[in-house]
Structures are given as C-alpha cells and as structure tokens.
Amino acid sequence: MTSQHSAKKSSKNTPKNNRTFKGFLLKFSFTALVLTIFYGGYLDWQIRSKMDGQIWHLPAEVYSRLESVKIADNLAFDEVIQILLDNEYRQTTMVAAPGDFKLEDDSIVVLRRAFPFPDKAEPQRVLRLRFSHNKLSRIEDLVTVKTVDEFRLAPKLIAMLQSDNEDRLAIPLQNYPRLLIDTLILTEDRRFYEHNGINPVGILRALIANIRAGQTVQGGSTLTQQLVKNLFLSRERTITRKANEALMSLVLDWRYDKNRILETYLNEIYLGQNGDTQIHGFELASQFYFGRSIREISLDQIALLVGMVKGPSLYNPWRNPQNALERRNIVLRLMLEHKMIGDELYQLLSQRPLGVQKKGQISRKYPAFIQTLQADLRRKLGEHKISSLLGARIFSTMDLKQQAQAENAVGNTVSQLQLKMKNPHLEGAMIITDYRTGEIRAVVGGLQTQYAGFNRALMAKRQIGSLVKPSIYLTALSNPEQFRLNTPINNQPITINVKGSPPWQPRNYDKKYSDSVMLMDALARSLNIPTVNIGMKVGLSKVIDTQKAMGWDNVEIPKVPAMLLGSYTISPYDVTKLYQTLANQGGRIALTTVDSIADRQGNLIFQHDKSAKQVVPQEAAFQTLFAMQQTVERGTARSLQKDYADLHLAGKTGTTNESRDTWFVGIDGKNISTVWLGRDDNGETKLTGASGALQIYKDYLNRTNIEKLAITPPTTVKWVGINQYGDWDCESYRTIPIWLNNGQNFCGETSSPSLTPTTETETPPQESLWDVLDNPNPPAQ
C-alpha cells in the first residue's frame, strides 16, 4: 500500500516539476534574450559611436612647398627632367602609373599625380611637354586635348603631427588598387563577401587547435574580426574577448556594408613601427617602405605589404629580409594558384629583391624645419587651435632641394673645419628664406640633421658682431641731408665714457686706422670706428627704432654704445627677419614655414600673407644693399668674387670677441642665407666670419643654381660718379646710387662733410646716448 501511495504521489509531482523546470527555462531564456539584446544594443552603440564619428585622431599631414612647371619660366629640357626627378617621378619606357614619365625626341610625356591642392583637388593628368630650341614651349593635356600654361606637381609628405603615437594616411576605398584588395582577401579572408562577419569553419578550426594546445595559439579571424580587435578590443587572448570579438563582428557586418568595413580595415591595419610611432594603413606603409603611394607600387611590393599583415615585426623587410622575402613569395604563389598572375610573371616577380627604400623615415626627416614650423603654428594659431589641426593638410614652404643642399653644405664644411682647426666641437646652423615672400625654404639646426635635438637656427642666441652694422648704416642713410654713401667718416681710435662702466675703447678688427673713410667703404670693410661714430651721431634710440621696425621688435636690445658692434645675442632666425626687410628694399614680411592649411574637407583655414609693409625708406635700403655688394666685391667677403663675380651678390660677415661666433648673411636674386658657425660651449673657434661661416655659404653656392642679384632702384635714386676721394665726378667710371631727396645736381660738388664725434659747440642729437655719458665730449682725436 505504501509503495502504491508513493508511486501515485510521484506521478502527481512529475507534471508539476516539469512545469516548474519549463517555467525556469522560459524565464532564463527570456532574461538571456533581453540581456543579449541590451548587450548587443550596447555593442551597436559602441560601434556606431566610433564608425560614425571620428574613428582616428588623424595626424596633421605636412607637405613640402607647392611647385609648378610653367612655360613662362623658360625651362630647359634638362631642367624639367631634374624637376620631375626631384619630385620622385620615374623615367620609364612606358607611361603606365602616376609618377611615370618618358622621353620622346623633343618632348616629355608625364602622368601627373592626382592631389588635393589647397584651393582644389586635381585629378591625374597625362601631359606632353614640348620643347623648342631646348626650351619648354608648349604643354598639352592629352586627355582633354587642350594646351595649358602650367601644371602643379603634388608635394611630398615630409612630416605628420599630433598623432598620439599612431601615424596613418586615410584614403578612400576607390583610391586603393583593385589588385591590392583582391590579394588581401585571397590571403586573409576568402569568404569576406559571403560571411556575416565571422567564419564558423575558421573559428571551429582555431578552437580545436586551441583546446589541443591548452591555450590560445591560433585565430580564425575574418577581416571584420581583425578590424573589431584593432578598433575596439584589447590585445589579450581570452575566451571572453573572443566572444566579444565575434558578437561585435556580427553587429558591425549587420550595421555597415562590406566596402565601408574594407575601407576602414585598409586604413587601420598595423604594418610597422617608425621609432616610437606606429605605422597604420596600407597607404602610409607604402610610403614608409617604398617611398611611393600605394597606387604606384609594383605587384611584388603589394604582395610584400599583404604578407606583412600576418606579422609586421616578423616580416619586417629591414630587420628580417629573408623572412619578408619568403612571405612575399608565398603570397605570390597564392596569386599564381588562383590564376591572378601567370607562371611567367610569377617567376619574374619572385626573383626580384624586396625593393624597399633605405630605412624609412616618415616624420623625422627634417627635424629642424619641423620644429620651426611647429613654433610658427603656435605663433600664428595659438595653442588652443593647434589641436583642431588633426587630419589637416599643412602646406609648408620647404624646398626639398634647397633643404638637402643646405644640410650637405653645413655638414661638409663644418666637418672639414673641425679637422683643419683641430676643433671637434664646432657646430653650424643655416636658414634660407625667399625675401620677396618671407617663405623659409630650408632650416639646418646642426650637424646631426636627422635627429630632433637642439635647433641652433631657431633657439641658439649668440652675439652677432658686425651683422648689426647694415641696420646702423641704413638708419644713417635714411637721413640724406647728413649721410650718403660717399660721406667721409672719421676712422681714428676713440674712447667713450659711460656712467657706471669702464671707458669703452672700440677698435677696428685689423687695428688699422686712417683720417677718414667713405661710408660705403666702412661698411664693406666692416670697420668698427666709423660704425660707432655713425651710430652715436644718429642716436642709439633711432638705431634701435630702425632695428625693431625691420624685425627685431621682440629682441632685447641694450641701449648702450657697445650695441653698435653687436654685443647682444640674437638667433639666426631673428637675424633673418631684419635682413629680409633689407633685401626686400624696406618691405617687411613675416617669416613663415607655413604657406597654407586646409582641413580634411579641403577648406582653406590659413593662408600666409605675402604683402609687404614698408617700414624703412626704400632709397636707404637700396643704398645699403649696394654697400653690401661692395662687401662682396672688395670687402670682407671678397673671396666670393673668384667664382661668383657675375652674380653681384650682397653679403655681410660677422665675428664676435675672441672669435667665439662667426656669421655670414648672403643675398642673391631671390634668397637670403643666414649662416652661423661656432661652439655650443661658447668656446673660441679661431675663425672669422670670412674663414668660418662664409665657407659654408660658398659650399652651398657650389651645390645650387643662384639667381643674379639685380636690384631695381627707386625712381628717386640716380647713379652719380665719384672720384677716389669720394668727391662728385660725373666723368668717373665709379658710380654710386644717390637719393635725390631735393632734386639735387651733384656733379662738380664735394661730398658731405667729414663726420667726427660731437664737440662742445655742437648740440647732441635728440635721444642720443651722449646724454648718458660722463663726458659728453669725447677726447679729441
């Protein structure tokens, strides 16, 4: 009876237990479904937040200056070829890819690269350049069948800024070669266009391998999963992370089309390391390893990049060339097996070397110029706006050829002088600037041009010595009633007493003196005594006002007599500011390394203002330039005459006390070159401006094509003859420029009175430093 009763009770409980279990299962399933939906929604929000927003903190791309080929420039055949080669175009027998050109009798056919220029994007163009009598005479667009007067060349990427240790060049999918895409899919994910984000067969295969190994050793990831892992997840290998990867891949594939996923992958994938900075995306990797855009590399180079996806470090072509070669050939073999290439082409490509360039440097090649550019950005835009430049294109003013020539000139000359003078601590710096636009073409901060160290061109403040003199003479020549180029200036030793200081006794460098010397000869020979006499006569305040107007407005200039001989410190960058104004005949333009900036959409957000402000009389600047030409012709820089007499260069040497610093500023028909040579510890160089810094300038001239300095005088300046004593002589062969401020006729007259220091009967000039002297009347000479 008891047994029967228990059986009945059990049979009654079974349906109830089943109902309880089913209820629990239903609740659990519903809860799991709700949680999955919510979690899936959360993952979807995470994915959309990134994919629909700013996926990457894109670096600002810095490019070299924009260059054009113009008929108006009257370019020779060889000059055009050199321009193309300098811009990394390739001479070929068949024009097939952007960047190719070939020679045909009296013409050149070139496939010009496409590029988003600051004002507008321009597509690639097939152009024929025709020459007549060895000069460019006609440019034909072979697609539109029209002639053009000029065409622009795409600038070179020279740096990337503000990238959070990740560099990439994100480009649209349509700009990637179809062959790259097909090779990538063949190698990494053959069912990419068929699966829904994950490949179950691949995952199962990887799961079995991992279980057997007892740890995660293999992945079966699709391209979508790889993208999810790189964009959203950590690098740890756990089951939880793998589950998230799979779920997010499903969501990503459901939310976005395959092309969007593929484009993001191509721009995201990690492909190497540039120092501390990661190289992401195939476009940047192509430039990093081959020095060319992804659209211009060969099929075997595509195979190498695709092969590196599996392990950028293991297959690094510089560190592990044999591994890289084997991996590339595996990819080529896959392409052969799937009939993407034929056997003959496979044999050819698999025998090729890797074809990588010398160790890649994307963002560290021109550190001194880039440091100067970053300082420019802070001055022009302010710190708060620099962060908004992410993804922008910065078009710099750097001329790649001039930069290389300047680097080689500094490196070669300083190294030679180190050996010659047995002084291994010598250093050098150089800045080259187009004085008509204020655009800086080259910056060299020291001998180690490839390393971002101390930028002497921008940061080193050193005494300038005689470089100060042209500004003093220009101040005097701005007053033509008192000073002209042939005005005789006293050249006898003087003593000046200043309150609170020992008597100051300036001396000429060569310790030679005379009764007087013409003003222009005093500058040409860089004589100290006449310079001090002129400066004291016009007044230190006026000299300082002139210097600040010409570009030294942020320089601390001491109001003491010694400032007339450059006793204060200035950087080569600031020196260039003043000489830019002088070379531009008194027209001051702000120096810049930035020509323009465009955002990612191509909108112009900055443009350098090339307009000049006249800050000193043009007539005075013209006469000062003429006197500086005399410096080269017969003065302290006369060694230039041997090879460059026909260029009529202007220049100024500078040497400081005990030869601690040597300087030279050279002016040609287009550029100013400011050169400093010295020691970081301020030690003696045993050199002068002529034997030190000038030698760097000479080396630079030997490497480049220089325009003749042909200055057009203002209409108020006329050429008048003088004799050997400086008196007017219209029959003389020697003529000088004279400012006809009152319509004078100088023939037959004597020159201006000889200038001597102020005497007791003279009234000191207003705001002159004679006011602060113990004895306002210097000793009689």
UniProtKB/Swiss-Prot annotation:
GO terms for biological process: cell wall organization; peptidoglycan biosynthetic process; proteolysis; regulation of cell shape; response to antibiotic. Its main location: membrane. GO terms for molecular function: penicillin binding; peptidoglycan glycosyltransferase activity; serine-type D-Ala-D-Ala carboxypeptidase activity. The active site is at E188 (proton donor), S466 (acyl-ester intermediate). The keyword Nucleus does not apply. Residues 749-768 have a biased composition (Low complexity). In the N-terminal section; belongs to the glycosyltransferase 51 family. The keyword Transferase applies. Its EC number is 2.4.99.28, 3.4.16.4. GO terms for cellular component: outer membrane-bounded periplasmic space; peptidoglycan-based cell wall; plasma membrane. Keywords: Antibiotic resistance, Carboxypeptidase, Cell inner membrane, Cell membrane, Cell shape, Cell wall biogenesis/degradation, Glycosyltransferase, Hydrolase, Membrane, Multifunctional enzyme, Peptidoglycan synthesis, Protease, Transferase. Residues 151-322 are annotated as: Transglycosylase. It comes from the Bacteria. It catalyses: [GlcNAc-(1->4)-Mur2Ac(oyl-L-Ala-gamma-D-Glu-L-Lys-D-Ala-D-Ala)](n)-di-trans,octa-cis-undecaprenyl diphosphate + beta-D-GlcNAc-(1->4)-Mur2Ac(oyl-L-Ala-gamma-D-Glu-L-Lys-D-Ala-D-Ala)-di-trans,octa-cis-undecaprenyl diphosphate = [GlcNAc-(1->4)-Mur2Ac(oyl-L-Ala-gamma-D-Glu-L-Lys-D-Ala-D-Ala)](n+1)-di-trans,octa-cis-undecaprenyl diphosphate + di-trans,octa-cis-undecaprenyl diphosphate + H(+); Preferential cleavage: (Ac)2-L-Lys-D-Ala-|-D-Ala. Also transpeptidation of peptidyl-alanyl moieties that are N-acyl substituents of D-alanine. Cell wall formation. Synthesis of cross-linked peptidoglycan from the lipid intermediates. The enzyme has a penicillin-insensitive transglycosylase N-terminal domain (formation of linear glycan strands) and a penicillin-sensitive transpeptidase C-terminal domain (cross-linking of the peptide subunits). Residues 749-781 are annotated as: Disordered. Residues 415-702 are annotated as: Transpeptidase. Pathway: Cell wall biogenesis; peptidoglycan biosynthesis. InterPro entries: Beta-lactam/transpept-like (IPR012338), Glyco_trans_51 (IPR001264), Glycosyltr_51/Transpeptidase (IPR050396), Lysozyme-like_dom_sf (IPR023346), PBP_1b (IPR011813), PBP_transglycosylase (IPR036950), PCN-bd_Tpept (IPR001460), UB2H (IPR028166). PANTHER family: BINDING PROTEIN TRANSPEPTIDASE, PUTATIVE-RELATED, PENICILLIN-BINDING PROTEIN 1B. It is found in: Cell inner membrane. This is Penicillin-binding protein 1B.
